[in-house]
């Protein structure tokens, strides 16, 4: 609890009665502690304050740097752009675009392009 800065009102409180942010941190701490080869993270920073978001991002980067695979599912485009080495955009249940890291860091209008694909725009080339 200390590592992920979980702050319950008291130590007797049940996890289900914690704030959404503290629940989120406990779930992620539990999964990271298991040192998985693959981590599926759905909205890992939902409900967290700025400091906790930064900490979670650093933990995900550590896992990535250890060679772990992370499937990050998020509605936060900046989060995806900052943490991903490849982005797949899903629209109507199908992958409408797959964008490699080189394009993520080099395209100045990448947010707009991803937004078009999220809305069902044309496929990304290369």
Predicted feature locations:
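Glycine-rich phosphate-binding loops of nucleotide-dependent enzymes
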Residues: 1-126
């Amino acid at each position: 609890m200390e590592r992920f800065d979980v702050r319950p009102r008291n130590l007797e409180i049940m996890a289900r009665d914690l704030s959404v942010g503290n629940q989120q941190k406990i779930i992620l701490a539990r999964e990271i502690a298991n040192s998985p080869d693959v981590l599926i993270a759905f909205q890992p920073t939902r409900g967290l304050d700025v400091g906790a978001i930064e900490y979670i991002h650093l933990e995900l980067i550590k896992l990535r740097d250890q060679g772990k695979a992370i499937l990050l599912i998020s509605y936060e485009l900046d989060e995806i752009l900052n943490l991903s080495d490849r982005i797949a955009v899903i629209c109507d249940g199908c992958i409408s675009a797959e964008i490699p890291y080189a394009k993520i860091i080099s395209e100045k209008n990448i947010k707009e392009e991803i937004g078009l694909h999220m809305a069902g725009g044309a496929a990304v080339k290369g």
